[in-house]
Regions:
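Residues within alpha-helical segments
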Residues: 15, 51, 55, 148-151
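Nudix hydrolase/Nudix homology domain
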Residues: 28-33, 94-100, 107-157
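Conserved Nudix-box catalytic region and its N-terminal flanking loop in Nudix hydrolases
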Residues: 21-72
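Conserved beta-strand residues within beta-sheet cores
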Residues: 11-13, 61, 102
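Generic structural "secondary-structure junction" signal
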Residues: 35, 42, 81-82, 86-89, ...
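Acidic, metal-coordinating catalytic segment for phosphate/diphosphate chemistry
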Residues: 1-15, 19, 91
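Active-site-adjacent beta-strand/loop module that shapes the phosphate/pyrophosphate-binding cleft
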Residues: 74-112
Length: 157
């Protein structure tokens, strides 16, 4: 999706974990190993965007990890908050505020089979913490850190 706003866009990144492995994609355009994710569209909330992006990019339905607070009154719907937030520069004049979610496949019986989104990605794979170090091109330290925290936190649940 193209940028929605001129200065800052809101995005989601989803680190899906099963059996102590995290799902990562090799992004064609960026030539980087990344989690699933993308822009939050104007007609959706962050939770909806995380579920949509995960399904579009991997074919997997997931449960987001986190606490859903009680609602506070009529017209209020509580959302699962992201595990982390960051802001990262895309260009000299554009930034993304990233909402970083951890998730696990809804179907926990067996192994969820990820489907490659060929128009966007060169590869998709489940990696252990150790396998992240062997990816080519090398995964950024930040993405590797989030991946390892996700494996540690979700892999034990």
């Amino acid at each position: 999706m193209a940028h929605i706003h001129e200065k800052i866009d809101f995005t989601v990144a989803i680190f899906v974990v099963q059996q102590s492995r995290v799902l990562v994609i090799h992004h064609k355009k960026l030539n980087k190993w990344l989690p699933l994710g993308g822009h939050i569209e104007l007609d959706e909330d962050p939770e909806q965007a995380a579920l949509r992006e995960t399904k579009e990019e991997s074919g997997i339905d997931v449960d987001l990890i986190g606490e859903r607070p009680p609602t506070t009154g009529p017209g209020t719907r509580a959302l699962i908050g992201p595990r982390f937030l960051d802001i990262h520069r895309i260009s000299e004049k554009h930034e993304h505020i990233g909402m970083i979610y951890f998730a696990r496949p809804k179907n926990r019986a067996g192994t969820a089979q990820a489907t490659l989104a060929q128009s966007e990605h060169n590869d998709i794979r489940w990696c252990t913490s150790q396998e992240l170090d062997a990816l080519v091109p090398a995964m950024s330290d930040a993405v590797k850190w989030y991946s390892r925290v996700a494996i540690e936190e979700v892999g034990s649940r």
